[in-house]
Amino acid sequence: MSLSIPHGGTLINRWNPDYPLNEVTKTIELSNAELSDLELIGTGAYSPLTGFLTKADYDAVVETMRLADGTVWSIPITLAVTEEKAKELAIGDKAKLVYGGDVYGVIEIADIYRPDKTKEATLVYKTDELAHPGVRKLFEKPDVYVGGEITLVKRTDKGQFAAFYFDPTETRKRFAELGWNTVVGFQTRNPVHRAHEYIQKCALEIVDGLFLNPLVGETKADDIPADIRMESYQVLLENYYPKDRVFLGVFQAAMRYAGPREAIFHAMVRKNFGCTHFIVGRDHAGVGNYYGTYDAQKIFSNFTAEELGITPLFFEHSFYCTKCEGMASTKTCPHDAEHHVVLSGTKVREMLRNGQVPPSTFSRPEVAAVLIKGLQKREAVTPSAR
């Protein structure tokens, strides 16, 4: 077995820093999330996409979780403009893609269309409630979508995470250099506690390497900030993982909170990075009570192994059992819940912000120390952030 074939068969490359921008007069302003998507399309992380979705692909993705040609793709990657801006644009036009005054790309407009956002919300997020963060973002966006192939002409400033940004060509090269033929990807927007560590190490027993790929794009206000999380990942890997079996790199996309559909999307992207396997735990990419605990695992049954091209590894909720004296799940532990150390994410965040160290059966003390220090420092600067 060797590293996965890119989704769609070819790793897309839309990078051209020498693009003749002086020939392009029209502009479209990008949101932060669209800027991330632009770069991920351009570098091949979203292969086989070569641009923002046209209406045919958009409709197919929303309704069938496939592109118009049948390729598996579960999340609509779209570029939104206002009605006023849409009047300035026409099919066949080229437009600069601008963020913060800088030009990051160019789109060759192939389609201009008005989506049914309620339908998109209901099918992609399983709800049209504005309380859902993904739905709220969707309805905050302008009402017209522009589709077409892009060219990436400028890379974003990677800031403090620069050492952890890798394009798919780079991760594939690194995995090969490490001698890995099988690689399991792990997506997270949270600190890695003992339960996550347990399932990662279970997966490591059957593959050559682990690609820990935390998301550092836009998340909810109450999610633990990326800078604090990154420090916690580093201290965890330093103290508890074999250094030649783990690779840490960040994922710059925005979080959609689309649950099951986002699990498929996350798997396809990790396939492009070279992963042969992908971990799907309980309520992957979920929020609140919008999705069933294991809906993100069940959704994979809609597709054949061949069209997915990456092997999902499904794990149940794990915990420390005081009777077993170790990490376990209901698959391996016969004891009642009273013996299980389980804390909600909300409870843990509250403990950390109050300087309380969660039990070592839940979180490694080194990780807890980093999180407490980071959160308290942030609270001191922005006390209303809570």
Swiss-Prot record:
InterPro entries in UniProt: ATP-Sase_PUA-like_dom (IPR025980), PUA-like_sf (IPR015947), Rossmann-like_a/b/a_fold (IPR014729), SO4_adenylyltransferase_pro (IPR020792), Sulfurylase_cat_dom (IPR024951), Sulphate_adenylyltransferase (IPR002650)
GO molecular function: ATP binding; sulfate adenylyltransferase (ATP) activity
Catalytic reaction equation(s): sulfate + ATP + H(+) = adenosine 5'-phosphosulfate + diphosphate
EC main group: transferase
Entry EC number(s): 2.7.7.4
Disulphides: none
Matching Pfam families: ATP-sulfurylase, PUA_2
Keywords, comma-separated and alphabetical: ATP-binding, Nucleotide-binding, Nucleotidyltransferase, Transferase
Pathway terms, separated by semicolons: Sulfur metabolism; hydrogen sulfide biosynthesis; sulfite from sulfate: step 1/3
GO biological process annotation, one example: sulfate assimilation
NCBIfam families: PRK04149.1, sopT
Family membership: Belongs to the sulfate adenylyltransferase family.
Name this protein carries in UniProt: Sulfate adenylyltransferase
Record organism: Geobacillus thermodenitrificans (strain NG80-2)
Record lineage: Bacteria, Bacillati, Bacillota, Bacilli, Bacillales
